[in-house]
Amino acid sequence: MGPPESAAELAAEAVELREPELQLADPASPGEEHVDVEAEGAPGRGRCWPCGAWACGSRGEPEAKKKAPCPGLGLFYTVLSAFLFSVASLFVKKVQGVHAVEISAFRCVVQMLVIIPCLIYRKTGFIGPKGQRLFLFLRGVFGSSAMILMYYAFQTTSLADATVIAFSCPVFTSIFAWIFLKEKYSLWDAFFTLFAIAGVILIVRPPFIFGSDTSGMRESYSEHIKGTFAAIGHAVLAAITLVILRKMGKSVDYFLSIWYYVILGLPEAIIILFVIGEWSLPYCGLDRLFLILIGLLGLGGQIFITKAVQIEKAGLVAIMKTMDIVFAFIFQIAFFDNVPTWWTVGGALCVVVSTTGATIRRWLQGSK
């Protein structure tokens, strides 16, 4: 769901589970009901932004009369989602003196304040349908844990490295879907998995392969390793979350899925904070503003990526989602004066090729 749910989780989530009448979205992260606020209850067509056309079909209308959406609108939503997730990640990195777990707790509080009115308005309840509550519980636990690990990765290693590794989520999703959902796992999937692992190795640069050279790293190698494993843990947990959402299908409201994510994530974060003794009061000024914006930007990114896959081909969305990495590179250079190493660039290319290839291949198989 940055991010979350991170960008990687929500991106993979949305691309993996795209259906014509999608109700459920998973980054990644695929299983949640769409949020079409404009179309809700609107019998006619309205003005489309950014194209400005009154005849645009991106607004809700009777299905028999519905036309194709505004050209490029889905890709615009994808880029906007990537930007919002990346800005949220930047704010996580900029917050001073607040542990990643505490940032996760603040995000849960902010999103909870938004989700509760939405659930009341949509009259979906707060528990969920029978038979799905266990899956919702697991989705909440794994999703919130993935968020905590992602924020910890942002704090301990570079934005680019953490984002690239988290982007490998779809590769792990294919493996878990093969194990738990009995989906087909081909030689192509194995190739993409190995290619993604190669990309992660280039970023980690383990000493037994690359020696003791740590040039280009701002943080110590021990901190870099911690952040790297946190990002890998995020990708794995996000992939499990996607599989759970796919198992649930379309029977769970999008906002209800997020509700379990925040209502379980908040006590989880509070318990961890007291165990590790890292609770602290955020500084006045920008830090508190950043904490609020992290929650709002994360929710906005979730909504836009969900809307994007409803009106655009999943393969194109998968390609455009690489903007997450582009924004991470730009922000790392612009705000931290930290130029990514060529190892990171090479690793990013490997991960992008593998995850994009795996997603497009799955989309092509589903369209046959």
From Swiss-Prot:
Positions of transmembrane segments: 72-92, 100-120, 134-154, 161-181, 190-210, 225-245, 256-276, 289-309, 316-336, 340-360
SUPFAM superfamilies given in the database record: Multidrug resistance efflux transporter EmrE
Entry keyword set: Cell membrane, Endoplasmic reticulum, Membrane, Repeat, Transmembrane, Transmembrane helix
GO CC entries: endoplasmic reticulum membrane; plasma membrane
PANTHER family reported for this sequence: ACYL-MALONYL CONDENSING ENZYME-RELATED, SOLUTE CARRIER FAMILY 35 MEMBER G1
Function of the molecule: May play a role in intracellular calcium sensing and homeostasis. May act as a negative regulator of plasma membrane calcium-transporting ATPases preventing calcium efflux from the cell.
Name listed for the protein in its UniProt record: Solute carrier family 35 member G1
Organism: Mus musculus
Biological classification of the source: Eukaryota, Metazoa, Chordata, Craniata, Vertebrata
